[in-house]
C-alpha cells in the first residue's frame, strides 16, 4: 500500500513539472495538427464532398468510435483485465461525451461549412481561453490572476494576427456559421473543465475511451440520420481513419491525464 502511494506521488510530481507539461501538451498539439491534412485526404478517398456535412459527421463518428475502442483496449492491456466501463465511469463519461465529442464536433462541422477559414480559425482559437475563464469564474477550480488574463489576451491576439496575415475579415455573423463554431468552442471549454474535475475521481484513460466510444456512436447515428454515408471505402481510407483514431486516442487521453494533475490554465 505504501509502495503504491509512493508511486502515485512520484507520478504526480512528474506530471506537474512545467517542462513535462509543456512537452506533453506540445506533443498533443502536434498530433492534432497532423490530423487536419489527413482528414481532407480521407474525405477525398472516401468521396465525402466538402459541403456534405452529414457524411463528414459520419466520418468523425467512425473515427471517434474506433478511438474509444483503442483506448479501452490499451487500458485493458495495461491493467491486465478487460476494462468494461461501470456505472461510476458512465456517470462521468456521459456529460463529457455530450460536451466534447457530440456537442463540439457536431456544431464545429456544420459551422465550418458555413463560414470562412479566417473567421473559423479565429473563433476556434477562443477554445482554450474560454476553458480557462470557465474554470476560474464559473466552476471556481482555480483563481483568476493578472498573468492568466494577460496570457489569454496575448494568446488570442496571436491567433487573430496569424489568421489575418494575407487575408481579409468581413464582419458578417451567421448562427449556422460563426455561431455554431462559437457553440463548439463553448462545448470544448465545458468539456475541458469537466475532464479536469472527473479525471481526479476516475481513471482518465478509461473515462477518455468511454466518452469517445459513446460520442462516436451518437455522431455516427446523427450523421446517418441526416443522410450521410461513406461512399467509397478503400484500404487507404481505412488506414487514414485508423491513424486519425490513434491520434485522438493518444492525444486526448494524454490531455486528460495532464488535466487530472494540473490546473486548466497550466495545460
Give the predicted meaning of each segment.
Residues 45, 49-101, 130-134, 187-191, ...:
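Transmembrane alpha-helices of multi-pass small-molecule transport proteins
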Residues 42, 59, 111, 137-140, ...:
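Hydrophobic/aromatic residues within transmembrane alpha-helices
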Residues 71, 75, 133-134, 146-166, ...:
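Hydrophobic transmembrane alpha-helices of multi-pass small-molecule transport proteins
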Residues 121-124, 140-161, 171-177, 234-239:
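Loop-to-transmembrane alpha-helix entry segments
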Residues 58-61, 65, 69, 99-100, ...:
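Specific alpha-helical transmembrane segments that line the substrate/conduction pathway
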Residues 31-52, 66, 105-115, 123, ...:
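Juxtamembrane C-cap of transmembrane helices in multi-pass membrane transport proteins
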Residues 2-61, 170-197, 217, 221, ...:
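Glycine-/small-residue-enriched transmembrane alpha-helix faces in small-molecule transporters
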Residues 76-120, 124, 161, 244-264:
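Specific transmembrane alpha-helical segments of multi-pass solute transporters/efflux pumps
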Amino acid at each position: 500500500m505504501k509502495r503504491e502511494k509512493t508511486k502515485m506521488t512520484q507520478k504526480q510530481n512528474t506530471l506537474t513539472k512545467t517542462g513535462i507539461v509543456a512537452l506533453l501538451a506540445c506533443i498533443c498539439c502536434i498530433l492534432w495538427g497532423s490530423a487536419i491534412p489527413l482528414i481532407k485526404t480521407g474525405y477525398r478517398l472516401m468521396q465525402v464532398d466538402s459541403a456534405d456535412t452529414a457524411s463528414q459527421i459520419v466520418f468523425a463518428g467512425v473515427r471517434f468510435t474506433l478511438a474509444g475502442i483503442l483506448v479501452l483496449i490499451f487500458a485493458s492491456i495495461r491493467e491486465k483485465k478487460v476494462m468494461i466501463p461501470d456505472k461510476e465511469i458512465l456517470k462521468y463519461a456521459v456529460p463529457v461525451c455530450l460536451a466534447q465529442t457530440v456537442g463540439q464536433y457536431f456544431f464545429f462541422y456544420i459551422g465550418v461549412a458555413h463560414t470562412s477559414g479566417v473567421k473559423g480559425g479565429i473563433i476556434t482559437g477562443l477554445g482554450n481561453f474560454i476553458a480557462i475563464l470557465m474554470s476560474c469564474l464559473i466552476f471556481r477550480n482555480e483563481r483568476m490572476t493578472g498573468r492568466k488574463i494577460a496570457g489569454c489576451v496575448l494568446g488570442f491576439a496571436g491567433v487573430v494576427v496569424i489568421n489575418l496575415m494575407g487575408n481579409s475579415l468581413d464582419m458578417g455573423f451567421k448562427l449556422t456559421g460563426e455561431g455554431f463554431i462559437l457553440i463548439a468552442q463553448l462545448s470544448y471549454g465545458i468539456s475541458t473543465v469537466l475532464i479536469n474535475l472527473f479525471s481526479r475521481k476516475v481513471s482518465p484513460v478509461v473515462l477518455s475511451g468511454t466518452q469517445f466510444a459513446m460520442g462516436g456512436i451518437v455522431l455516427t447515428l446523427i450523421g446517418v440520420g441526416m443522410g450521410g454515408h461513406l461512399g467509397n471505402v478503400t484500404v487507404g481510407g481505412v488506414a487514414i481513419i485508423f491513424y486519425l483514431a490513434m491520434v485522438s486516442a493518444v492525444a486526448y487521453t494524454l490531455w486528460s491525464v495532464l488535466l487530472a494533475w494540473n490546473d486548466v490554465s497550466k495545460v
